[in-house]
A protein has these predicted regions:
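C-terminal membrane-cytosol helix-exit motif in multi-pass small-molecule transporters
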Residues: 12-21, 233-260, 463-468
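Extracytoplasmic gate region of multi-pass secondary transporters
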Residues: 51-58, 185, 285-341, 399, ...
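C-terminal ends and interior cores of transmembrane alpha-helices
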Residues: 106-128, 364-378
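Cytoplasmic helix-loop-helix junction between adjacent transmembrane helices
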Residues: 138-175
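Glycine-rich segments within core transmembrane alpha-helices of 12-TM secondary carriers
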Residues: 167-193, 335-336, 424-434
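Helix-loop-helix hairpin linking two adjacent transmembrane segments in secondary transporters
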Residues: 173-249
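C-terminal transmembrane helical hairpin of 12-TM major facilitator-type secondary transporters
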Residues: 353-402
């Protein structure tokens, strides 16, 4: 049943993509753009599976990986991810998103293979080490390659989607994230369940027998938990091959005429930018730093819920709310898609592609939900589970608007990867902070979990209100001249992106 729902969501997303055509593109352009973003997006979804399979592994390993061990391992990876943009952002701006996503897929695949081998050796007692150090190192390598994924997908998107279409593409971006979370949690848990050493004979179907044949240990009859790393590794190699054949970095590579997306690079595509120019643009832009601050808070909230609810529900029984734990990945997938489309459609249809207003509304909503979690944590499991799912819905909307859309709008095609790298880096700095903090705090009391999240939702809301009226100057001109939708507020000087002018 869950697979049918996910396929339905995927088909609905594809249908909405073809339905939303505000610039009246030709049929072949729409089809070729779909052929471009679909394999790119599915690669990104499986990157998520190869990232959050650690969560499933932690629950399966039990005492071999404590909460504090898990917090340290995940934090090592997220801090690595956050700092990697200094290298891979400018690099992807130079080599293009196609090469970037292939680097991400192959690198993450190899790292997952090593994680699987480590798990196998430790669980079968052929290697006597504590998992925390070895996993921290290899997971950090995995996250370095993972960090190429977002900047690559947004780099390609920047050339193929006009600013007035990017809110909906941001929704597609959020949908792909949601599929990845579903793959990681629900498919990952299914893999763990099918590779248990002592399944009752009446419960072994062909899929279980195949998994046992492929992954069961000949050394010792133990659960083949390592399969949760090997399967996404194989999938990533397949998608890397498809990416090589199908993805084109720009419409011009498919023989379409030059396409002005009216973002911050409009009229500036001839300007050549060095790595230092790109980094200077990012770190001296007040607006980019505001967006980064919003994404820092979204990193705390997104992983503060997604990463810890399953740990909480395993540790503190939730009578009457078992449905949330049993279908966590599916719920994150469906509600993440809703959140992504809500944010994107509200931005494009109600606020002339301004990203601040829907982000502020969603952050305010998360604040209310986090307060509800704190109030009812010990008394009403259903409200806690519902609030957790709704926070996940809203935070995907914020993330797809900021990392998936605003970075490309205000960074422009020339600097998309560097800007989205900065912003995505702050997501994972926030993730690292919550991983360290909640790994420690929840060993004292689970009440600290929602209390820790509340101020970050408030900070994100305030920062989003600050950028309420922001639009790139080229977008503002497009609205005034083409759509006849004059913007009543003067643009902030940062939205003019003066950093591009005169740089050579």
């Amino acid at each position: 049943m869950s697979s049918i729902l996910v396929v339905t969501c995927l088909l609905t997303t594809i249908g909405l993509y073809f339905y939303n055509n505000p610039l009246s593109h030709g049929r072949w352009f729409m089809m070729r753009r779909f052929i471009n973003w679909f394999p790119l997006g599915m690669t990104y979804a499986f990157l998520y599976m190869g990232r959050y399979n650690l969560n499933v592994c932690k629950n399966a390993l039990g005492s071999l990986m404590t909460k504090e061990d898990f917090g340290l391992i995940f934090a090592a990876g997220t801090v690595t991810y956050a700092l990697s943009f200094l290298v891979n952002g400018p690099l992807v701006d130079r080599i293009g998103g196609k090469k970037g996503i292939i680097i991400a897929a192959i690198g993450s695949s190899l790292a997952n293979i090593v994680l699987g081998v480590l798990t196998y050796l430790v669980v079968t007692e052929q290697l006597k080490i504590k998992l925390v150090l070895a996993f921290s190192i290899v997971y950090a390598v995995n996250m370095y390659f993972q960090s190429y994924g977002a900047v690559s997908i947004i780099k390609v998107k920047a050339y193929w989607f006009h600013v007035r279409e990017r809110g909906v593409f941001g929704a597609i971006f959020g949908t792909l994230i949601s599929f990845g979370v579903y793959f990681a949690f629900d498919w990952g848990q299914a893999i763990v369940d099918m590779t248990k050493a002592n399944l009752p004979s009446g419960e072994t179907g062909w899929a279980q027998r195949a998994m046992q044949h492929l992954f069961a240990s000949n050394v010792k009859p133990v659960d083949a938990t390592w399969a949760v790393f090997f399967i996404p590794a194989a999938a990533l190699l397949v998608w890397a091959l498809l990416d090589w054949f199908f993805i084109k970095d720009t419409p011009e590579e498919c023989d379409f005429p030059p396409f002005d997306t009216h973002d911050a690079s409009s009229g500036q595509m001839h300007v050549k930018l060095s790595t230092m120019d790109l980094l200077k643009m990012v770190f001296t832009s007040r607006l980019m730093l505001i967006i980064a601050a919003i994404e820092f808070t979204s990193g705390v909230l997104r992983n503060g819920i997604m990463q810890w609810y399953t740990v909480f529900a395993h540790e503190v029984k939730q009578p009457g709310a078992e449905f949330f734990l049993g279908h966590w990945g599916l719920l994150l997938c469906i509600f993440g898609i809703i959140g992504g489309f809500a944010g994107g459609l509200i931005s494009d249809k109600c606020f002339t592609s301004r990203r601040g207003p829907p982000a502020a509304l969603l952050c305010g909503f998360m604040f209310v939900m986090a307060v509800l979690m704190a109030v009812f944590l010990k008394s009403n499991p259903f409200i806690v589970g519902s609030a957790a799912v709704l926070i996940s819905m809203a935070v995907i909307g914020v993330h797809s608007l900021m990392s998936g859309t605003a970075a490309a709008d205000f960074g422009g095609r020339k600097a998309t990867a560097t800007c989205s790298g900065l912003i995505d880096g702050f997501v994972y700095l926030g993730t690292g902070l919550q991983s360290f903090s909640l790994g420690y705090l929840t060993t004292r009391s689970w009440l600290w979990w929602p209390i820790f999240l509340i101020p970050f939702a408030a900070i994100g809301c305030v920062a989003a209100v600050v950028m309420w009226h922001e639009l790139p100057a080229a977008t503002r001109r497009y609205l005034n001249l083409i759509e006849r939708k004059p913007e009543p507020f003067d643009p902030d000087p940062m939205s003019e992106t003066p950093e591009l002018e005169g740089v050579s």
